[in-house]
């Protein structure tokens, strides 16, 4: 009698993740010498696909996640090109076309030191309405991810809140919500109290942020304070790695779980998008670990390590420009 062939363990089904937010043109100006006002300086100008939400969605697809982006673009060539390129990258793009408004653009000025400054002209990206969302887009989701500035301007903010509601009503059991604080400027412009109350009402499972973004939201340098509005806080510290705080089943008054995950510093003249790659790596690694039966703390470790790997890959890779036309 022939012995049955050994069977390998079944692989977990790829996670379904929806990201809601910007898909824009990035116009990146990289100065070769210190920037001076009132004169020309040498450098490079590149046109890239941009938007934090789009960057996260693209990296999720690269990492094997069933990635979906819900965004708004203009009825123009830029919008068509951006959507087509992202679909080629494996993302299921649900693009709302906004008549009479052009696709958003972000100017990124990169100094020789690597310091970045941004000029945001988001245009159509902010004009998605709650009524534009189709409930079936949210069927079976394991997680919905939003950059905070998808919540801080109307009518996009109402669409973001509605998207979270639809995810919880139509997504998989135990669907999770992650929010990246994304940028200091929009948090301060919206008002830290209002921004904090809005994010808190959404009851996110995870908030990802830099230390400066935490301070902008809370008004103090206390990253663990994010646990007042989320179950997990992942603090991105660049070359210093990441610090994770989590609430668990500890008794009231006990300190939260806290651990650091180091990374290897990567020399890069332009770090644009590295934080988005980290978010995607964390989400993919965390959900994958949970699906494989790893406990909560172990899954957070694995997710954070995966975030570092994705960010390092991003920093070491050449940045693709949009094809001409």
Q: Which residue stretches match the model-derived regions?
A:
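Active-site metal-binding loops of divalent metal-dependent hydrolases
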Residues: 23, 149, 277
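Conserved phosphate-binding/catalytic loop of the ribokinase/pfkB sugar-kinase fold
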Residues: 98, 108-155
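Glycine-rich phosphate/adenosyl-contacting loop at the front of the ribokinase-like
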Residues: 1-72, 77-84, 88, 106, ...
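Conserved beta-alpha-beta core of the PfkB/ribokinase-like small-molecule kinase fold
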Residues: 143-224, 240-242, 247-248
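Short beta-strand scaffold segments in enzyme catalytic cores
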Residues: 105-109, 117, 241-245
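Conserved phosphate-binding/catalytic region of the ribokinase-like
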Residues: 1-18, 219-325
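Cofactor-binding loop segments of dinucleotide-utilizing enzymes, especially the Rossmann-like FAD-
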Residues: 22, 71-75, 110-112, 121, ...
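A glycine-rich helix N-cap at a beta->alpha junction
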Residues: 85-101
């Amino acid at each position: 009698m022939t012995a049955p062939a050994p069977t390998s363990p079944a692989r977990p089904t790829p996670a379904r993740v929806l990201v809601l937010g910007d898909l824009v043109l990035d116009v990146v100006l990289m100065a070769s010498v210190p920037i001076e006002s009132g004169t020309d300086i040498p450098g490079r100008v590149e046109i890239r696909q941009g938007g934090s939400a789009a960057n996260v969605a693209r990296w999720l697809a690269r990492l094997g996640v069933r990635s979906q982006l819900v965004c708004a673009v203009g009825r123009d060539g830029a919008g068509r090109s951006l959507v087509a390129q992202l679909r080629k990258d494996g993302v299921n793009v649900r693009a709302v076309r906004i008549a009479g408004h052009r696709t958003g653009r972000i100017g990124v000025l990169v100094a020789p030191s690597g310091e970045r400054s941004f000029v945001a002209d988001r245009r159509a990206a902010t004009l998605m309405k709650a009524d534009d969302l189709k409930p079936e887009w949210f069927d079976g989701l394991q997680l919905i991810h939003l950059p905070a500035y998808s919540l801080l301007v109307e009518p996009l903010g109402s669409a973001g809140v509605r998207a979270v509601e639809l995810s919880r009503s139509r997504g998989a059991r135990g669907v999770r919500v992650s929010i990246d604080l994304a940028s200091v400027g929009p948090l301060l412009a919206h008002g830290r109290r209002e921004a904090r109350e809005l994010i808190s009402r959404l009851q996110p499972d995870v908030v990802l942020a830099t230390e400066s973004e935490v301070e902008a939201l809370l008004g103090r340098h206390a990253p663990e304070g994010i646990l007042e509005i989320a179950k997990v806080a992942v603090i991105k510290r660049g070359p210093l790695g990441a610090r994770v705080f989590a609430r668990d089943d500890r008794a009231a008054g006990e300190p939260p779980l806290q651990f650091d995950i180091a990374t290897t510093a990567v020399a890069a003249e332009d770090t644009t998008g590295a934080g988005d790659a980290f978010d995607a790596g964390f989400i993919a690694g965390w959900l994958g670990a949970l699906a494989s039966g790893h406990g909560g703390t172990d899954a957070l470790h694995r997710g954070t390590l995966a975030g570092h790997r994705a960010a390092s890959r991003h920093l070491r890779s050449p940045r693709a420009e949009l094809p001409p036309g």
